[in-house]
Amino acid sequence: MAAAKSALTDAKLDASTIADAQRFGVLIGSGVGGLESVERSCEILSTKGPRKISPFLLPALIGNTATAMVAIAVGAKGPNFGLVSACATGTHALGEALKYLQLGECDVMLAGGSEAAIT
């Protein structure tokens, strides 16, 4: 989230400077995502049983959660999805975002990758 907001600040963009939020997209990739949630849930499962697993486990694991949260925070309403391409995920997101710009489907794309597979 901090990197996304910093990128927009560096580009001198925000929701008020983008004429059409439908033409403002976000593509952020993550290679693993949610690893801490998996570890925590495994511990809960083994010590407290399956009924104590959070109903929010799946949303914490899916690859597009970061993209969705950033899009909501910055007011982007255009293309919005997450990518998973192992170590190439960030570059893959940049390439896909470039296609939207080249095809004239979007005016602004916020793209990149993020990972912290440490717990």
Set out the residue ranges of the language-model regions:
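Short, conserved beta-strand segments within well-ordered enzyme catalytic domains
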Residues: 1, 25-29
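Conserved FAD-binding subdomain of flavin-dependent enzymes
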Residues: 1-10
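Acyl-thioester C-C bond-transforming condensing/cleaving domain
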Residues: 9-20, 28-119
